[in-house]
Design a protein with these regions (language model features):
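Active-site cofactor/substrate anionic-group-binding motifs, chiefly glycine-
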Residues: 46-99
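Solvent-exposed alpha-helices and their adjacent loops that cap or buttress functional pockets
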Residues: 70-73, 102-104, 129, 152-156, ...
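N-terminal glycine-rich anion-binding loops that anchor highly charged ligand groups
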Residues: 2-5, 22-48, 62-73
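Phosphate/diphosphate-binding glycine-rich loops and adjacent basic-rich segments that engage nucleotide
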Residues: 145-181
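Generic N-terminal amphipathic, Lys/Arg-enriched alpha-helix
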Residues: 1-20
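A glycine- and small-aliphatic-rich helix-loop capping segment at beta-alpha/alpha-beta transitions
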Residues: 59, 126-135, 151-158
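A glycine-rich phosphate/pyrophosphate-binding beta-strand-loop-alpha-helix module
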Residues: 92, 96, 100-138
């Protein structure tokens, strides 16, 4: 089995993303997402997903230079517009904001729309737990698998993630989805 060093993955992912219009910082952050997912053995949301993201960038389906913006704020609840930006960067920004709101109000909820695939949803549960917050994250998807006993794609994977900080360096974490990733 071919082994690629984590640092080499980040460097190459970043190089390709910068060549497709990402800023240096956003390319580094996005490359880290791909490499960490691969490092954790979630290749479907790491190295195996990368060619598809490059294809989407080349087709203009992902806009590499946009930043999600808050469209509506109601105290502890906000709705954000992703502007077809890169899903993991938008989702990280949304979770950062949800944690800020939670620390201010005791709860923080951010809905993010018009974004791209957020990759491994569990990343944002960990992000919340590492910030000392309980993270509950979910997403809807396009139909990508058949219902039990069927052949045609009728249901989405629709992941649900929960993460709770237990102590300074430990969290209770559950990443559920309808198929094996």
């Amino acid at each position: 089995m071919l082994r690629i060093k984590y640092e080499d993955m980040v460097k190459e992912f970043k190089r390709v993303l910068v060549s497709r219009g990402f800023t240096e910082k956003n390319a580094e952050d996005a490359a880290t997402v791909f490499a960490l997912n691969s490092l954790d053995g979630i290749y479907s949301h790491g190295i195996n997903r990368f060619p598809r993201v490059v294809e989407y960038l080349d087709k203009g389906e992902i806009n590499p230079d946009v930043v999600a913006t808050c469209e509506m704020s109601m105290g502890a609840i906000e709705r954000w517009e992703g502007h077809r930006g890169f899903g993991p960067l938008n989702a990280k920004q949304a979770m950062d904001r949800a944690c800020e709101l939670a620390k201010q109000y005791g709860i923080g909820m951010v809905a993010l729309g018009n974004s791209n695939h957020w990759m491994r949803g569990g990343s944002y549960g960990w992000q919340a737990a590492n910030a000392g917050c309980i993270g509950i994250c979910w997403s809807n998807t396009m139909p990508n698998m058949p219902a039990w006993g069927g052949k045609d794609r009728k249901i989405g994977n629709n992941p649900l993630i929960m993460a709770v900080p237990k102590s300074k360096n430990s969290s209770c974490y559950n990443d559920n989805h309808m198929n094996r990733v």
